[in-house]
Swiss-Prot record:
EC number(s) recorded for this UniProt protein: 3.6.5.n1
Class of the enzyme per the UniProt entry, highest EC level: hydrolase
The protein's name: Elongation factor 4
Keyword Membrane in annotation: yes
Keyword list, A-Z: Cell inner membrane, Cell membrane, GTP-binding, Hydrolase, Membrane, Nucleotide-binding, Protein biosynthesis
Primary gene name: lepA
Gene Ontology biological process terms in this record: positive regulation of translation
Sample GO molecular function, one term: GTPase activity
Occurrences of domain tr-type G (ranges): 5-187
HAMAP family assigned: LepA (MF_00071)
Pfam family for this entry, one: EFG_C
Organism lineage string: Bacteria, Pseudomonadati, Pseudomonadota, Alphaproteobacteria, Candidatus Pelagibacterales
Length: 602
């Protein structure tokens, strides 16, 4: 059995695309975790979508044996964390399970926004940090400039920063030695009563729910009776194991170690991330501090294009939620789109990945409505309603005021793009709180309503700065806003799937653009179709789709048939009026996608 002072638990943190998973692969290979034949790029990225996009979505863990230069054997527990802002919750959970972090910075790019966010999370968790400068094999690598940036922007000493290359393997041995020297061993007592932190859980077809744990005190072993402190439920442990990175069974996990257990649980919601697991016969007086559960911040409707695929979509969402408890869904019905689901996500990339997985893994054609955020509607009577769907907004006369979520945004950009970025932030109702410089890069801090960045703020930043700017945000609470519900009516019928919350100042512009877009995208019918944008009962924009005109007078010749002509024209007029009254206007899928694009262009 390994002594606790020979264990090192650490997370790998970095901005997206700075080489975390590649360096993790190199460390695994260097410690003999996998043979040359078993190695594949991004070993710890288990989903196909992770490898294709080159991003980490779920935090992955691996236990390695390492013989250091001092001749002693050590156990290294690595957690490879996601780098994208949407998955920062995965990062925070992982950091709680470790004592130290390796901070990877791309030496060709320098410090980026997500680097800052993740480092601050690590420092808040009181981590020791080892800075690593990756991609030194590239001609554009600038070590001194990157070191200076780390010291100026983050405030970490870079005297012992390790230059390395995930591609060639240079510097990997130095990283391993630095981990042993600089990072602390875990604290904990093997002989104390059991206390475990539930770090993560996921569903396995054969084993049921697999629980990733970090043993704080005591030991956890097979056939032991354990208790979840938040639910008071008791279970018998069926399996104990570690990832090497292959799942390997062990007899027990001791204080300081990270591994997995299975207990035959079939429902993921019974395992709350951050919960304390203890010995059912000796429960402790108080639980571990744990951490805040993730809350969805972006909501949208998902509808099957073919209504017969509704059950397939329901089953698909249920299966995805088994492995991703951070997104929520509930049934929703729309007069325009039929039956579907209202889903909540951690951010736009999260939304994109869930919809892509549904389409790919379950072969469902999906229609996604405009993404929105959660508003707090304060009613005249004093109660507060959390609004996810604009079509459910109560009557304006019953509302006192509406609050919308705001974020604190950090943008790091080369200084030549500063003017363009400030203009975009101002257009998005942003309030600048800070501006600082490090060399030729600017660090901007803005407070912006989340609804303004939810569509494509990141994409616009990337396109106007040729991909050099990076963006990160955290939610700072709700603030009162002058918001109205913009309703869209087609042939005097409200289309709930197209309604949206907008700021009063932009309502007319957005309404006009939506009407113009729908006029182009809805096919003509035999009768005239009005397309209107409205706030409450007031119409603020209108376009008209002209009906087809049939010449009913072609067969009538001569000048004496005036009465006959009048009768035919009146009959046609009545038919058109009846068509307008009872005719159903089919709104094609392209119209919904077109409106979504308008929101992106705003």
């Amino acid at each position: 059995m390994t002594k606790i002072d020979h264990i090192r638990n650490f997370a790998i943190i970095a901005h997206i695309d700075h080489g975390k998973s590649t360096i993790a692969d190199r460390i695994i290979h260097s410690c003999g975790g996998l043979t040359e034949r078993e190695m594949k790029a991004q070993v710890l990225d288990s989903m196909d979508i992770e490898r294709e996009r080159g991003i980490t979505i779920k935090a992955q863990t691996v236990k390695l044996n390492y013989k250091a230069k001092d001749g002693k054997d050590y156990i290294l527990n690595i957690i490879d964390t996601p780098g994208h802002v949407d998955f920062s919750y995965e990062v925070s959970r992982s950091l709680y399970a470790c004592e130290g972090s390796i901070l990877i910075v791309d030496s060709t790019q320098g410090v980026e926004a997500q680097t800052l966010a993740n480092v601050y999370q690590a420092l808040d968790t009181k981590h020791e940090i080892v800075p690593v400068l990756n991609k030194v094999d590239l001609p554009a690598s600038d070590l001194e400039k990157t070191k200076k940036q780390i010291e100026e922007v983050i405030g970490i000493d870079t005297e012992n920063a390790i230059p390395c290359s995930g591609k060639t393997g240079e510097g990997i041995e130095d990283i391993l030695e630095q981990i042993i020297v600089s990072l602390p061993a875990p604290e904990g007592e093997k002989d104390a009563d059991l206390k475990c932190l539930l770090v993560d859980s996921w569903y396995d077809t054969y084993l049921g729910v697999v629980i990733l744990v970090r043993v704080i005190n005591g030991k956890i072993s097979k056939n032991m009776k354990i208790k979840m402190m938040s639910t008071d439920q008791e279970y018998i442990i069926e399996k104990v194991g570690v990832f090497t990175p292959k799942a390997t069974d062990v007899n027990e996990l001791n204080a300081g170690e990270i591994g997995f257990i299975t207990t035959g649980i079939k429902i993921l919601s019974e395992t709350k991330v951050g919960d304390t697991i203890c010995d059912a016969t000796k429960p402790p007086q108080e639980a571990l501090p744990g951490f805040k559960p993730s809350k969805p911040v972006v909501f949208c409707g998902l509808f099957p294009v073919d209504s017969s695929e509704y059950q397939k979509l329901k089953d698909g969402l249920g299966k995805l939620q088994l492995n991703d408890a951070s997104f929520s869904y509930e049934a929703e019905s729309s007069s325009a789109l039929g039956l579907g689901f209202r889903c909540g996500f951690l951010g736009l990339l999260h939304l994109e990945i869930i919809t892509e997985r549904l389409e790919r893994e379950f072969d469902i054609n999906l229609l996604t409505t405009t993404p929105g955020v959660v508003y707090k509607v304060h009613m005249n009577k004093g109660d507060i309603i959390e609004l996810q769907n604009p079509s459910s907004l109560p009557e304006p006369t019953l509302i006192k005021f509406i609050e919308e979520p705001w974020i604190k945004a950090t943008i790091i950009t080369p200084d030549q793009y500063l003017g363009a970025i400030i203009k975009v932030c101002q257009d998005k109702r942003g309030v600048q709180t800070n501006l600082s410089y490090s060399g030729n890069r600017a660090v901007l801090n803005y407070e912006i309503p989340l609804n303004e960045v939810v569509f494509d703020f990141n994409d616009r930043l990337k396109s106007m700065t040729s991909g050099y700017a990076s963006f990160d945000y955290e939610i700072i609470g709700h603030r009162e806003g002058d918001l109205v519900k913009l309703g869209i009516l087609v042939n005097a019928e409200p289309v709930d799937a197209l309604s949206m919350m907008v700021h009063k100042d932009f309502a007319q512009t957005v309404g006009r653009e939506v009407c113009e877009k729908l006029k182009d995208l809805i096919p003509r019918h035999n009768f005239m179709i009005p397309v209107q944008a409205a706030i409450g009962g007031k119409i603020i924009a209108r376009e008209t789709i002209k009906g087809f005109k049939k010449d009913v007078l072609t067969k009538i010749h001569g000048g004496g048939a005036r009465d006959r002509k009048r009768k035919l024209l009146d009959k046609q007029k009545k038919g058109k009026a009846r068509g307008k009254q009872f005719g159903k206007v089919e709104i094609p899928q392209e119209a919904f996608i077109g409106v979504l694009k308008i929101n992106k262009d705003q």
